[in-house]
Amino acid sequence: MNRLLKQVCMVVVSSFMMASMLTHAASLPDFTELVEKASPAVVNISTEQTVTTKTANEGGQQLGPNSEELNEFFKHFFGQQPFGQQAPPQQGQRSSLGSGFIISHDGYVLTNNHVIDGADVIHVRLNDRREYVAKLVGTDPRTDLALLKIEADDLPIVKMGDSDKLKPGQWVLAIGSPFGFDYTVTAGIVSATGRSLPSDNYVPFIQTDVAINPGNSGGPLFNLDGEVVGINSQIYTRSGGFMGVSFAIPSKVAMSVVDQLKSDGKVSRAWLGVLIQDVNNELAESFGLDRSNGALISRVLPDSPAEKAGLKSGDIILEFNGQSIAHSGELPYIVGQMKADEKVDAKVYRDGKEQTISVTLEARPNDPKVVAQSQQDQNRLGMIVGEVPADMAKKFEIDNGVVIEQVLGGTAARNGLQQGDVITMLNGKRITSVAEFAKIAKDIPSGRSVPMRVIRQGYPMFIPFKIMD
């Protein structure tokens, strides 16, 4: 009897587990139909370019048969060649690989600017293996988008979706050519929306965990309705490979750029002229703000619309042109959608009060110099500081501050300060000398958090600084 009871229990448990597995499987999306419908409008893009190349020096590492593609990968994601890659220059041919997709029946193709940047010839290969030499209609390096045109008719096209409707947790799918493997399909979820990256602050990126690798760039990101909601652009990595964090340009941003490229061959956008950062809870507290939102100005560029309007470093922009700023990444996009010579109101928080400042926007310069930088380290409070060397100040456009020459631990270390940071402001007061820095720091009570402005590796930012006992 006991034996029979055990067998019955095993059957019941097995049935329950099987039912649970089937229910779970049924709840997962089936991408088959989506891929079949969307793939014909996805293209493979390859380029030819005559370049001056470098070979590995003594002790340099060899990267194998696909070294050129890997070199491009390192260059795009890290801004430099792999370690050891220096040698006498040689003339040669370089090819790059990427993805794209067809947005009109008469042959307009959208991809990333970095996929075709500097190319002499651009090849577009369709799903049915037809191949065309594409004409470059225009590019927008600030959003990393490029519009191509191939001479063909009745082409399959993608359906464009509304990226504003995307929410974290929704399924998304990518089709592209990672490492040259055509029409590779990967899927994942939206991790976040509105991500602002330091080098691309005109794009509120879609962050996903979809596997993206070299060759995926420029390819479409689909929602479950088969609509393109993003253009896969870049990844975050410490290993050189995919680590679960990838970024896509929202379709809304892309189509705005496409419209201008089609009509003018270039993109014009308004310019405010500030460097900004998010306001976290500690910064909000240190500024006396009752909520952690807005865009904190860390630097006002010389002769910019912001400077002319009277905006200052340390101002927190709460609203711009009537639109609330929840986080700093929203401001560049709002400004970028506006036209030069538009006059707008900015609601800012300054010295514990809200005020409205009128700003007249201007056309963005082709190459505004927005970067300052830093190198060494500082004094007291767990650090040794020194005067900023004249050559450093001139080179990086630093007009005041002290440089951290050494972090000793304690307060400096706990506040995240690093050797090479340049401290330009503390508790709302400009730092002009080592003595002045020590005096201002001495007047700050222990345990109280105050705003500190630092320049780190060329990027200015505010941090909440708290003196530890």
UniProtKB/Swiss-Prot annotation:
Keywords: Hydrolase, Periplasm, Protease, Repeat, Serine protease, Signal, Stress response. GO terms for biological process: proteolysis. It comes from the Bacteria. Pfam families: PDZ_2 (PF13180), PDZ_6 (PF17820), Trypsin_2 (PF13365). One of its GO terms (cellular component) is periplasmic space. It is an enzyme of class 3 (hydrolase). It is found in: Periplasm. SUPFAM superfamilies: PDZ domain-like, Trypsin-like serine proteases. Might be efficient in the degradation of transiently denatured and unfolded proteins which accumulate in the periplasm following stress conditions. PANTHER family: PERIPLASMIC SERINE ENDOPROTEASE DEGP-LIKE-RELATED (PTHR22939:SF130), SERINE PROTEASE FAMILY S1C HTRA-RELATED (PTHR22939). This is Probable periplasmic serine endoprotease DegP-like. It comes from Marinomonas sp. (strain MWYL1).
